[in-house]
Regions:
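Metallo-beta-lactamase
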Residues: 52-62
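Conserved beta-strand hairpin/beta-sheet module of binuclear metal-dependent hydrolase folds
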Residues: 1-49
Length: 62
C-alpha cells in the first residue's frame, strides 16, 4: 500500500509530498520547506514513521 502525506510550506503555500510504502521506503516530492520550523516538521514526520528516503524529486522547478 502506498501512503501519502503532504505538507504546505513557505509563503508561496508550496505542497511537499512524502510517499512511502509498507516497507518504509519513501520519496519526497518537491521539498519546499522554507525555515527551521518547517524542516523540523518534515524531519519529525519521517523519523516518527521510520521512513527511509530513497529519492528526492523536484518537479516544479522554474
Amino acid at each position: 500500500m502506498l501512503n501519502i502525506q503532504f505538507f504546505t510550506f513557505n509563503p508561496f503555500s508550496e505542497n511537499t509530498y512524502v510517499l512511502y510504502n509498507e516497507n518504509k521506503n519513501g520519496v519526497i516530492i518537491d521539498p519546499g520547506n522554507w525555515n527551521e520550523k518547517e524542516t523540523e516538521a518534515l524531519e519529525n514526520f519521517i523519523k516518527e514513521k521510520e521512513i527511509k528516503i530513497n529519492e528526492i524529486l523536484l518537479v516544479n522547478n522554474v
